[in-house]
């Protein structure tokens, strides 16, 4: 047994000559003189991209007082006709309309500092999802009913794709005054 261990260690200890011609040694970086100059000699700024006069008409969203809610929240409140067009779009894509409502229209945390179930991301569903709905007036009628029942709550319409199991669209249909 000892002789077999000696033979195996002797075979491992044998080292061949090092091959130095495999990789060329590092000689440092090349001189920058060999590279062509790509800089302009003058400081001509006329070729730089610019949004020019459009800067004066841009506005910044004020961080206080105007909260952004969902899709289309930067627009004025949607009229009944505008809501009907959005719901028609939702129905044309074969999405299931759902109506939800909440006292707070944005994500908030009052129970814990980390995100969880009760942080305002989940709204209460108004009745059941409207499977089989084919007319926008049915959805608008349900929104009006939710507004009458809860006038101080936000009401939103979501479009749910039951084939992919995802929410595809969501927008505020009613904001309390």
Swiss-Prot record:
It is found in: Plastid, Chloroplast. Signal peptide: none annotated. Gene3D superfamilies: Ribulose bisphosphate carboxylase, small subunit. Induction: Accumulates to medium levels when grown under continuous white light. GO terms for biological process: photorespiration; reductive pentose-phosphate cycle. Belongs to the RuBisCO small chain family. This protein is coded by one member of a small multigene family. Heterohexadecamer of 8 large and 8 small subunits. The gene is RBCS6. Keywords: Calvin cycle, Carbon dioxide fixation, Chloroplast, Photorespiration, Photosynthesis, Plastid, Transit peptide. One of its GO terms (cellular component) is chloroplast. Residues 1-56 form a transit peptide. HAMAP family: RuBisCO_S_bact. Its main location: plastid. This is Ribulose bisphosphate carboxylase small subunit, chloroplastic 6. Transmembrane segments: none annotated. One of its GO terms (molecular function) is ribulose-bisphosphate carboxylase activity. RuBisCO catalyzes two reactions: the carboxylation of D-ribulose 1,5-bisphosphate, the primary event in carbon dioxide fixation, as well as the oxidative fragmentation of the pentose substrate. Both reactions occur simultaneously and in competition at the same active site. Although the small subunit is not catalytic it is essential for maximal activity. InterPro entries: RuBisCO_ssu (IPR024681), RuBisCO_ssu_dom (IPR000894), RuBisCO_ssu_N (IPR024680), RuBisCO_ssu_sf (IPR036385). It comes from the Eukaryota. The lineage of its organism: Eukaryota, Viridiplantae, Streptophyta, Embryophyta, Tracheophyta. The keyword Heme does not apply. It holds the Pfam family RbcS. It comes from Lemna gibba (Swollen duckweed).
């Amino acid at each position: 047994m000892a002789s077999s261990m000696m033979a195996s260690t002797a075979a491992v200890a044998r080292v061949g000559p090092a091959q130095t011609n495999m990789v060329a040694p590092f000689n440092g970086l090349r001189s920058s003189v060999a590279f062509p100059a790509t800089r302009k000699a003058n400081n001509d700024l006329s070729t730089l991209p610019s949004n020019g006069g459009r800067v004066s008409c841009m506005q910044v969203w004020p961080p206080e007082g105007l909260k952004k809610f969902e899709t289309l929240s930067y627009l004025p409140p949607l009229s009944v006709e505008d809501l009907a067009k959005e719901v028609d779009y939702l129905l044309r894509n074969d999405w299931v309309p759902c109506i939800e409502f909440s006292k707070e229209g944005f994500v908030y945390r009052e129970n814990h500092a980390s995100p969880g179930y009760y942080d305002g991301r989940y709204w209460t569903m108004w009745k059941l999802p409207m499977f089989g709905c084919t007319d926008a007036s049915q959805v608008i009628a349900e929104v009006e009913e939710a507004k009458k029942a809860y006038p101080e709550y936000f009401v939103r319409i979501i479009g749910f794709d039951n084939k992919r199991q995802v929410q595809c669209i969501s927008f505020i249909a009613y904001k309390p005054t």
